[in-house]
Amino acid sequence: MLFVSTTRHANPKTSSLLRSLWVPAALVALIGAAVRVGMLATVAAAQDDKLWGLLNKWDAKHYVEIARGGYFGADISTDGPVHETTMAFFPGFPFLVRAISSILGTGEAGTAIALNVLFSIALAAGVMALAAQMGMGKWAQVLSAVVVTSAPMSIVFSMPYTEALFGALAIWAVVALVGERWWAAAAYIFVAGLVRLTAVDLVAVFGLMVLLRARKNWRAWAAVAFSIVPLVGYLWWSSSHLKE
């Protein structure tokens, strides 16, 4: 997390990073979100539908209901016990939404969408940081962020979905791995393991990177082991309930 001093003696490196990375990333993410939501609003109007309803369709309903009622109290229509459906969704995102909405007194759906705006900015910034590591110039970095945040179905970045959060965690994990900052990578992947099952791919890449670049570094292997804890823990916990 980047904190920027607002005093007259702000760190020049921090101020430079803000201008070169986070401001362009915010512009890319916010303009992209405005375009996507604007296009969806046009479609909604043409079909006599409601934009808010479209933004909360599909799995978005499940995430919002888990945020409201938890795995066992979600108001979701199912053929069996509700947790047999809700436990397909990892807890990181809905419970973060629940915590923030409780603190701010805001609705879960709106909170989720607002959080995803911030996560989209972090995703765009991560793409730019990775492009910079690869030696790309400023405009190539910005274009890379545009391509990633405007991929097909990127409207989910503006819905109560996990793609923006997971994408941000994944890209910053890769940035850390390329820089051989093993414990920073472990922290990102640890959190990603609370968000989506696909965090297993990040763990696999982490292990491969350590094998290739730091195979004799026990601290790096400890970081790999640490990163997988929430993923394994949630699968064990949910499986224990689904066996009942």
Where are the regions a protein language model picked out?
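Short acidic/glycine- and proline-prone juxtamembrane loop motifs at membrane-interface regions
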Residues: 158-165
